[in-house]
Amino acid sequence: MLEGIIWAVSAGIMLGLYALPEKFTRNFSYENTWSLFFVITMFIVPYIAAVLLLNGLEIFGMISSSVLVKMGIASLLWGIGVVLWGKAISHIGLSLGFSIFIGTLIFIGSLIPWFIDASGNFQINLPDNNILFTILAGLSIVLIGVVFNGRAGLIREADESEIKKEIPSSTKNSMLSGILIAVVGGVLATAFSYSNAIGKEPFILAAQELGLAEWKASIGVMNVIYVSGGIAAIIYYAVALTSNKAWGLFKTKSLGKNVGFIIIMSILNFTASVTFSYAASELGPDAGKTVGYAIFNAMSVLTATLSGLIVGEWKQASSSARKNLYIGLISMVLGIIIVSIGNGLGA
């Protein structure tokens, strides 16, 4: 149990930190940083992980085409959602971009299993009332946290505009736009849960047939999701780089350092998911989706928020903005814990 908890904490910290290196890139536009991130994260890192941990690509040939097609379509939506997540972080910072996106993802994603079966078909499957109301209570608190975080962002924008003597509504990258982008991204990114639900069982059976540990099946699932989602990301960034005439920025003298920071982002992002899968297997099927789920998500939100504070995202924010941020953070962590307790009631 202790080992599983340590791995879950580590996974949450890695996910919370993954976007931080973006703040240290130089002479890159948003499009340059995130396009490279998606190329490395969605294609290169998953391939290396599959070769090293799955002993090659044989496992993918053992999965039926119908499963792969369903996973691929859902993953395209997830890819769009993650693109919006990166855009939200660029607009409103690490603390808000992360917490609002993850909060929305948890809220919508927790409802999906009640209406989608393991085959990806629509089927109402509500849990017992005690489980249902506990989870709904937790999700309501998560939603309250998202609202407080959004309010904190709007207050912060007003504070910063007052200091700079600007009119808040005239700023190009408005806080409200960033918040909406994070929410829409979170909704679309719930397609990850749909894709994972479809692919989980087939990949576990294939992994067992190959003599691999069951937790390694998640690497196969993530490869399909990441590559499919990466297609959406590559199309978007190719258009964005062209329309904003940003291709030339790749010639900067800071390219080497920037690529180094982006590789760190990619490794943290992918490794966080793999580490959590391992943590869940160590904790067992019951504790994995309760204790592990709570620790992973709570630590990621806490880490991202603290990182944003440390690098000065809230330096010019008033005490009112910070107060709303802290209330939102506490609400989200509390809500995540209650959702996990509700899941545990059904274990």
Q: For the regions a protein language model found, what residue spans apply to each?
A:
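Polytopic alpha-helical membrane proteins, predominantly small-molecule transporters/carriers
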Residues: 1-347
